[in-house]
Amino acid sequence: KNEELKFEYRNSIISQKNIIVLETRLKLKKGESQEIKSKMDEYAKSRKEKQPIEYPSAGSTFKRGKDFITAKLIDEAGLKGYQIGGAQVSEKHAGFIINKGDATATDILNLIEYVKKEIHKKFDKNIELEVQVIGEK
């Protein structure tokens, strides 16, 4: 239940305490199959237009800030397309770091740190990772 897990925008007790969910029960609503398919197609089209799904990535790299849109700041900082090794800030959506083909974990982590430092330097904002980094460089 929401009260127990304290769900909020991209956060919950589950993510704070590194809990692994092994089982869940979902409550679904019935709907018209054609209407559901139409919505799914709409979401897929929107995702394809706005997100760099043609390249490997871990999805959205940075969380949206409380009072700012992180991807917008990254774009305004001129970092779209910025690359370290094979890791690049997506030109399609600045909130994604993509693998242009030969990125190493070190390339990606170095690019993340560079973006975080540039945003802090230019806008005095601290941006948070949405992805979880496991392991070391």
Predicted regions, residues:
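Phosphate/pyrophosphate- and phosphate-bearing ligand-binding catalytic cores of soluble enzymes
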Residues: K1-N110, K117, K122, N126-K137
